[in-house]
């Protein structure tokens, strides 16, 4: 698990041995690993998504912040396209050069965006937060 995390990260140096050990510990328990991959299984198995499309998706009315790493090896940016049709108040921020692990690969920028969003302020773009 630790090798997967570090090899898929944009900034492997941000993953201390302690953090990787937590991923490995949590991922080594069968019940935890099952929970960790069920989201992806549901995407692949299908059925639920197409069934829900036929029934209609209720629009999400809660203000929503989506932070997305453009270099995510598990989920492409295309996954986010059209999300605004299902979320009335969506703020979407892309992180160029950042992997699936946005909060670890770009913690300063992700936290600045979360802080602004939770305060009701304008959420900055990733590029404007670069040091």
Label every model-predicted segment:
Residues 1-51:
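Helix-rich cap/lid subdomain of alpha/beta-hydrolase
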Residues 28-31, 75, 105:
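Residue-level signal for the nucleotide or nucleotide-sugar donor/cofactor binding architecture
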């Amino acid at each position: 698990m630790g090798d997967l995390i570090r090899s898929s990260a944009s900034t492997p140096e941000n993953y201390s041995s302690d953090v990787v050990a937590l991923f490995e510990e949590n991922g080594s328990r069968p019940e935890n690993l099952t929970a960790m991959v069920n989201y992806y299984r549901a995407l692949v198995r299908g059925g639920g998504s197409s069934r829900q499309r036929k029934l209609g998706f209720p629009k999400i009315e809660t203000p929503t912040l989506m932070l997305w790493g453009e270099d995510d090896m598990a989920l492409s940016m295309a996954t986010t396209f059209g999300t605004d049709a299902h979320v009335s108040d969506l703020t979407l921020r892309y992180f160029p050069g950042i992997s699936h692990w946005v909060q670890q690969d770009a913690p300063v920028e992700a936290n600045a965006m979360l802080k602004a969003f939770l305060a009701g302020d304008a959420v900055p773009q990733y590029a404007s937060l670069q040091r």
